[in-house]
Amino acid sequence: MSTAYSLSKPLERRRSIAVTIGDVVVGGHSPIVVQSMTNTDTADVDATVAQIAALWQVGSQLVRITVDRDEAAAAVPKIRERLERLGFIVPLVGDFHYIGHKLLSEHPACAEALAKYRINPGNVGFGAKKDRQFAEIIEIACRYRKPIRIGVNWGSLDNVLLTRLMDENAQQAKPLSVAEVMRETVVQSALHSAVWAEEIGLGRDQIILSAKVSDVQDLIAVYSTLAERCDYALHLGLTEAGMGTKGVVASSVALGILLQQGIGDTIRISLTPEPGGDRTREVKVAQELLQVMGFRQFFPVVAACPGCGRTTSKVFQQLAQKIEADLYKNMAVWREKYPGVESLKVAVMGCIVNGPGESKHADIGISLPGIGESPAAPVFIEGQKVKILRGNHIAEEFESLLSHYIHTRFGQD
């Protein structure tokens, strides 16, 4: 039995209503779902299918696509059909703004092909048309038995609601700050829309809410309030998180705090990709976040020290990098061949200070020699030292031991 362990207690999640989207369940007692969104022109069937397939293959359980005009709506059933022919059964979420009622009404094949609709109360319609157009979308969802995400975004808030709350706040003896009124508007917009959708006929088990803002502290405040006031399933995401490290850090901090409080049933890490960048990165970051917090296990963990003046070379860094890359590359096949392999923990350490201890805590680990240490690398499996490697082929020998361990422990034959 493995000796790899965590000292933390299991995290308790907020109770929410389960919503079924295709073959994926969001909320209830289901694991937190990772989702993503394409950035292709949906009318370009080839490009959109290719990107959806790439996102699904790295682990996106739901994929959202823009449906912004007739050509995009007409392409949706073709996209779904093409994906199914390729063997990719991916629940597709249609992202609608401004004319969703028109597109869903005039393109019934699109309405049927999608697994879920996303609408924004702030731009579903304006003035006298808003109520009618919102109701039309909900009625279509009821007709086709599709769940809906009511996705509020503070960049496109319902101005009528915002103005009313601002006016009411101004009459108070101790008025709230503008930021507090903005946050309350986001929450009320989501909740009022959900209640209204129910009154039209949509079931509580067909509603997911999101309330996205671009500031970390505001996001935490908004979702904390939303979670207190309802039991709808919640979609977490920091909108306009940005590019590169900043985007990853901002999203991880905001979502991590909420997840630690038990809030959140599905997440998306919204990263602005660099020109020519890999769209799948947002999926990998979401998976890493859920894994390091102990909510999900997607792939083996490789623990490696950062290196310091005690380490003699970059060998342990190169070995750790290669092992992690090989494990990740093989996971698509290994999940079937070696059930449970995603729980594996490997340690690749660079000196005697923490090397042996960390290696003992892993399923399998190696402690490479540092400055002044004997040129030997002990290997530990499930807490026991099983071998000492020496010479110029330590990396290759450890990789061989790792492969044998995976086959022995997780193989079915």
UniProtKB/Swiss-Prot annotation:
Pfam families: GcpE. GO terms for biological process: isopentenyl diphosphate biosynthetic process, methylerythritol 4-phosphate pathway; terpenoid biosynthetic process. Binds 1 [4Fe-4S] cluster. InterPro entries: Dihydropteroate_synth-like_sf (IPR011005), IspG_bac (IPR016425), IspG_bac-typ (IPR004588), NO2/SO3_Rdtase_4Fe4S_sf (IPR045854). It comes from the Bacteria. Keywords: 4Fe-4S, Iron, Iron-sulfur, Isoprene biosynthesis, Metal-binding, Oxidoreductase. One of its GO terms (molecular function) is 4 iron, 4 sulfur cluster binding. [4Fe-4S] cluster binds at C305, C308, C351, E358. Pathway: Isoprenoid biosynthesis; isopentenyl diphosphate biosynthesis via DXP pathway; isopentenyl diphosphate from 1-deoxy-D-xylulose 5-phosphate: step 5/6. It catalyses: (2E)-4-hydroxy-3-methylbut-2-enyl diphosphate + oxidized [flavodoxin] + H2O + 2 H(+) = 2-C-methyl-D-erythritol 2,4-cyclic diphosphate + reduced [flavodoxin]. Its cofactor is [4Fe-4S] cluster. Belongs to the IspG family. Converts 2C-methyl-D-erythritol 2,4-cyclodiphosphate (ME-2,4cPP) into 1-hydroxy-2-methyl-2-(E)-butenyl 4-diphosphate. This is 4-hydroxy-3-methylbut-2-en-1-yl diphosphate synthase (flavodoxin). The gene is ispG.
